[in-house]
Amino acid sequence: MIEDKKVIVQNKKALFNYFIEEILEAGIVLKGSEVQSLRQGKASIEESHASDNGHEVFLYNCHITEYEKANRFNHSTRRPRKLLLHAKEIKKIIGRIRIKGYTLVALSMYFNKKNKVKVELGIAKGKKLYDKRAAIKEKDWKKDQSRLIRQK
């Protein structure tokens, strides 16, 4: 989306497990020790997803490793983190994820040009097993094609 961003972590499994229909950008509420840990790149959003809690949206299962120099002021690694969105966006998201089969998945986390941590979210629909198999076959075929072209 934005050219001036320093990517902290990406969720590569999300593109394999889901059909991404729409991509959104959201701010995230963090503690100081969490930001320091993110600057070191110590985070994982592989299993993370977002969900609504009334009129707010929270990011769940996002693992941010404890910052070793924060000692007693450290954060819990998997706490729910509030996402910062406009009210219109929240209503739109809640309407979409309440439909059966849709979920809100974290795709990447990055620092923008103002050094604020942003989360890229995708409104996604889960893939069936046969969809995943078809994606693997297509990927393998593209690899084979490129090998054949290089050999000629």
Swiss-Prot record:
By its UniProt entry, which PROSITE patterns does this protein fall under? SSRP (PS01317)
Using the UniProt record, give the first listed, main subcellular location: cytoplasm
* UniProt KW keywords: Cytoplasm, RNA-binding
First and last residue of the signal peptide: none
Q: Which GO terms describe its molecular function?
A: RNA binding
Superkingdom of this protein's organism: Bacteria
CDD domains annotated for this entry? SmpB
Localization, UniProt: Cytoplasm
> Which GO BP terms, alphabetically?
trans-translation
State the GO CC annotations: cytosol
| NCBIfam families documented for this protein | PRK05422.1 (NF003843), smpB (TIGR00086)
Q: PANTHER family of this UniProt entry?
A: SSRA-BINDING PROTEIN, TMRNA-BINDING COMPONENT OF TRANS-TRANSLATION TAGGING COMPLEX
Q: Which family does it belong to?
A: Belongs to the SmpB family.
* Role noted for this protein: Required for rescue of stalled ribosomes mediated by trans-translation. Binds to transfer-messenger RNA (tmRNA), required for stable association of tmRNA with ribosomes. tmRNA and SmpB together mimic tRNA shape, replacing the anticodon stem-loop with SmpB. tmRNA is encoded by the ssrA gene; the 2 termini fold to resemble tRNA(Ala) and it encodes a 'tag peptide', a short internal open reading frame. During trans-translation Ala-aminoacylated tmRNA acts like a tRNA, entering the A-site of stalled ribosomes, displacing the stalled mRNA.
Which named protein is this?
SsrA-binding protein
Annotated organism of origin: Rickettsia prowazekii (strain Madrid E)
Q: What gene, per UniProt, encodes this protein?
A: smpB
